[in-house]
Amino acid sequence: ANAAWSFSDALRAGKIFDDLNIYLFEEPLRTDDYAGSAELANRLNTRIAGYETEVLLTNFARLIEGRCVDVVQPDISWAGGFTECRKIAAVAEAHCMETAPHAFSSGILLAASLHFSAGLSNGAMVELDMTENGLRAGLLKEPFKAVNGYVELDDTKYGLGIELDESVIEKYRVEL
């Protein structure tokens, strides 16, 4: 819902989602609507996921400890990288919540998010965009492929397990 719905609209939609057995209801309310998010999460069976736009550990902790979400979705590129996101995931794990990183930009972020999630005991999934994106698929010499909802990681390669296509980097290069 992209943090754009009113509480009443989110509740109404959430009850329909409950009947349809929808897996997640992502970011129904504003990120800073802690009371509304907690009440919504309490009143629905559909799990509330969020908030990819949040960037601070302290605010994620407030969302988690206040039971405003059921699934935490930090974006590694926005929320402080691996180190800060591991702290966020640890707070979520301490509250028996899953972590599902958000990865909607380049192939590098997707690789980082996949490896990050794979290394978590409470890693649920990675939210990734399946639309065409030259910086996601084209940037990698060997793009990730989802098969039946899963992406297999190659543990024989170092680091993030990716190699960048220099011709694509050249295409987007800007001299400053």
Q: Could you say what each language-model-derived stretch is?
A:
Residues 140-176:
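C-terminal extensions of enzymes
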Residues 1-7, 49:
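Active-site mouth loops of central-metabolism enzymes
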